[in-house]
Amino acid sequence: MENLTPRQIVEYLDKYIIGQEAAKKAVAVALRNRYRRKLLPPHLKDEIIPKNILMIGPTGVGKTEIARRLAKLIKAPFVKVEATKFTEVGYVGRDVEGMIRDLVETSLRMVREEKIKMVEDKAYNLAVERLSEIMIPNPKKENIKNPFEMFFGGIREDAAKTDPAYDELNYRRRELQDKIKKGFLDNEMVEIEVEEQKTPMVEVFGVGGIEEMGLNFQDILGGLIPPRRKKRRVTVKEALKILTQQEAQKLIDMDEVQREAIKRAEEDGIVFLDEIDKIASTGNTHGPDVSRGGVQRDILPIVEGSTVLTKYGPVKTDHILFIAAGAFHMSKPSDLIPELQGRFPIRVELKSLTVEDFKKILTVPENALTKQYVELLATEGVNLKFTEDSLEEIAKMAYTVNERNENIGARRLITILEKVLEDLSFNAPEMWGQTVVIDRKFVQDKLSEIVHDSDLSRYIL
């Protein structure tokens, strides 16, 4: 996925997001520039910083979805945060550096999963071996009565390995391992030892606790206090899953995982900063605006490049791509502090959705809403079909309600479709084998009264 061209990235985004070509092009170019930067000599590589993007547009038009799909495409660490969750240093709330710690945690989880996948087969074989030893344990050792035998215990053990009984034990275990692998014993019960989940410590440091300082007392004390183990009775299938995870954990080098996670967060990380318009000052210098300005000033050093301390080590934010988004109904991008405006040089405006866009959203994307409902009801044996005129009617109604009430973009389609299919979803278990066709009349019967009554539509749709 490294060397995708901007055109290929836009084509991929087209499968899931309708319209918004300008925004798609902007993120595609930003992504390609990352690839280009990696090909440069080291002295130039450090000089080139990512061009952060500011997306301006109403809710439900695809701002978050573009960033989320992009991160999924390139398998990059991605974190979405709301700017309103953060507070200025000295106020109760989350510290802005928390977004970088979240990014590193996401990156660590991704790298760990990749490493575990690489050792999965080996871990599985070790788990099968361990499970066979639990199910057919070694015979209990005899009590040593003669003190001299204590000095020659090693000789006794070696002698035991050449004992015919030992060969018999190994043969039985190999047979058992074969049955475990073939799944013959999946529902058998077995008792295994598992580590107890650590109970969270009492939080004394307010919101965010000591995590905000990049410390974790449980990790510090982990080496001093051995983990407690408890016995659990589970099926062989479940035991195999637990033991495979334990064995995989032993096979991977966590120091290497942490180093790679930090590097990936620094080089490929994407932070999606939503609701940035809500922290824009509207001209007042008192009340909540004071704190808003403080949050902007706190975000500034992170966006322009600084070092954030995390429990896995220091993380440089110089090459992390920041995508900010906001509706800017009550404020303008120029209401942000000038320094922060300058850190988002690429600005793209996302357009409000038209009736035609709504219709495409219902059918074109790979995860289109109508396809989801067809598949959901197919599990109950109901064959659901949407006619062309029904899709036009749903799109028209979604647009009308958005214009009349609050404009929530494509999310309005979910509300309307739920209302249209409410009775059908309820009765589906008793309709096995039936075909239901949703046409214009069906949609109008369910919704026309609600849509045309502005008071009703405000509460129901």
Curated annotation (Swiss-Prot):
The UniProt entry lists the main location of this chain as cytoplasm
Identify the coding gene: hslU
Q: Which Pfam families match?
A: AAA, AAA_2
Task: List residues binding ATP.
Answer: I18, G60, V61, G62, K63, T64, E65, D274, E339, R411
Keyword Chaperone present in the record's keywords: the answer is yes
For this entry, the protein name equals ATP-dependent protease ATPase subunit HslU
Quote the cellular component terms of the Gene Ontology held in the record: HslUV protease complex
Report the protein's function: ATPase subunit of a proteasome-like degradation complex; this subunit has chaperone activity. The binding of ATP and its subsequent hydrolysis by HslU are essential for unfolding of protein substrates subsequently hydrolyzed by HslV. HslU recognizes the N-terminal part of its protein substrates and unfolds these before they are guided to HslV for hydrolysis.
Upper lineage ranks? Bacteria, Bacillati, Bacillota, Clostridia, Thermoanaerobacterales
What biological process terms from GO does the record include? protein unfolding; proteolysis involved in protein catabolic process
Gene source species: Carboxydothermus hydrogenoformans (strain ATCC BAA-161 / DSM 6008 / Z-2901)
* A single MF term (Gene Ontology): proteasome-activating activity
Q: Which UniProt keywords apply?
A: ATP-binding, Chaperone, Cytoplasm, Nucleotide-binding, Stress response
Location in the cell reads: Cytoplasm
